[in-house]
Every structure is written in C-alpha cells, then in structure tokens.
Amino acid sequence: KDFIYKEQYSGTPIFAINFADKVETDYIQNDSVTKLTFQSVFNDLTDNMEASLYSHARMYTQWSTKFKRCVECGEEIQFIHGGSKWVCTRSQCPLADPLQHRNNAAYPRTDPVVITAIVNRDWSKCCLARSKRSIGKGIIMYSTVAGFMEPGETIESSCQREVWEETGIDVKYKDITIVKSQPWPYPQNLMIGCIATVDFNGQNEIIDLNHDPELLDAQWFDTRDLSNSLATYESGFLLPLKLDNAKYSLDPEITVQLPGKNAIAYDLVTYVVKKFEETV
C-alpha cells in the first residue's frame, strides 16, 4: 500500500529477500514457487520498471552477502538506509577519521565497462566478435567488443585500447562516440555504449586477434545482413542472425546469435543499422 512520509514523500515499499544461502529443500514446495534461471528472469520482465527493480534488488542482495565485516578493522558492519550503505559498528574504526576525510561507511561499487560497436565510415560494415567463453550449449554468439575501463582512463581511451587489444583494429581517439549507458548489476557494472568509426585504408581495418587473445573470432559483417535480422526480431534473450554462413565461413549447421533486447549490444547494433539505412 502506498505510504506518505513527511507529507511530501510517497511511494510503495519494495523488499528484496536473498535466498542465496538456502537449498531447495528450504523452499516452500508448491505450485506458486517457480525456480528461475538468469535467462528466464529476463524473458519474464515486462518493462523497464520491472527490470530496474530486479536489477536493484539483485545488486543490493549480492552486495550485502559479499560484505559481513569491516574491510579496515574486521568488526561487524551494519547495513543502513534500506541496505544501500553499510557502516562499521566500531566507533574507533580507523575508517572513521574526519581529519583524513574518511568515514566508516561504504557504498556499493560500480565497475565501468566500455561496449563498442566498430563500424566503417559509411556504416555499411560492422565488426562483431565471438568470445572464447562458452555462452551456452549449442549457442554461437557474436557481439560487440567489451572490456573494463582501467583506472585513470577516459571512456574514449578505454574504448580505443579495448578495440585494438581484442581485434587489432586501429581506431582514432577522435572517432569514438559515446551513445548511451546501461546499468548492469551482474554483479556491479555500468555499461557504456560507444561507436568506434574506422577509416578503411587497407591497414586500419585489418583484424588481428593476437594482441590479447580473448576472442575466438571477429569479422566484418555487412550491416544489411544485420538489418534483415532486426527486421524480423520481436523479443527474447538472444537475437537469431539470418546470415549466409558460407559468406562468413561459418559452420553451415550452426545458428548464429546476437544479444537480445535486454543488452546494450543490441541497442548499439540497432543504432548502426539505423544510421546505415539513413545513408542509402
């Protein structure tokens, strides 16, 4: 039920319960309890409000599970402000030193990640990559390039470095555009979506996976092929790509996937396709 606080604040309280330390035998065994997977949760979310509530709940419950004692003195901690912050219960904790501009409180951390769609100048080509990490049984997924920002980096320099490290493609700092961001608290990331534009000159666009061998493959895909896939896609955790596998030297028996509408990679590819269609 809605409540009002101090006459000007109102809303509906929402609580998250963490079952991470429970086993299945602890759960109520009836038809109203459904065991969810990471994918099924995303498939069941109906709008951005639900997705936001779920992501907040997941982040805070994971954070509260991860920290039990003060990282400075080892004393027990207490979660306050609805679980959005913890304080050390020891009054003489070294963290509580106002002269050093320190206090005995801590907040959830956020790790920024740059997600980059690499395109040529006229938007007709988009480089997508396949990770060595297993996505799931029988799933072959190509996506945009991604990597964590390092301390002291700008978003643009991080994007430039990640593109070169993973694909060998040489993109100039000035040719990186920040498009949008997306919270991704799995466990604690902020996805920063970028477009890296490459001038094809016989050298810049050459793919080399040997600088930091994280990828199994990376290829320049025709944007028109991606557009055909987007045109028939409705929803889901993954987007099936309607590709001519022979054209890209892929196993003719496999179905290639792209991250679905829940991921910023999908938004970036959609952005690329829209820009391409505006030019033709």
Predicted segments with their positions:
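Nudix hydrolase/Nudix homology domain
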Residues: 1-67, 78-80, 135-141, 187, ...
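Beta-rich nucleic-acid/ligand-interaction surfaces
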Residues: 86-87, 175-189
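N-terminal strand-loop-strand
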Residues: 67-68, 82, 86, 90-143, ...
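Short Gly/Pro-enriched turn/cap motifs at secondary-structure boundaries
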Residues: 105-108, 184-185, 210
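Generic recognition of flexible, low-complexity loop/linker segments
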Residues: 103-104, 114-115, 180-182, 206, ...
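The catalytic Nudix box helix
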Residues: 144-179, 194-196
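Active-site pocket-lining segments that scaffold enzyme catalytic pockets across diverse folds
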Residues: 71-77
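Active-site-adjacent beta-strand/loop module that shapes the phosphate/pyrophosphate-binding cleft
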Residues: 182-208
